């Protein structure tokens, strides 16, 4: 059982290293998928009937 625990730990560390995006210390690109200021989902809440903001 200890073998599987050690194996899982090592595979987890390897996964974290491989899955890490970009270079260490590089700034995060929040606009990678487009302009973050765009509305998500379509209709703004203030245009939906019955919702008062």
From Swiss-Prot:
Q: Which UniProt keywords apply?
A: Protease inhibitor, Secreted, Serine protease inhibitor, Signal
Q: What is the lineage of its organism?
A: Eukaryota, Metazoa, Ecdysozoa, Arthropoda, Hexapoda
What this protein is reported to do is described as: Potent and specific inhibitor of human thrombin. It is also a potent inhibitor of thrombin-induced platelet aggregation. It is capable of antagonizing host hemostasis and facilitating blood feeding.
Q: What is this protein called?
A: Tsetse thrombin inhibitor
Signal peptide positions are 1-21
Localization (cell): Secreted
Free-text tissue specificity from the UniProt record: Expressed at high levels in salivary glands and midguts of adult tsetse flies.
Say which species the protein is native to: Glossina morsitans morsitans
In the record, what terms sit under GO molecular function?
serine-type endopeptidase inhibitor activity
One GO cellular component term, please give it: extracellular region
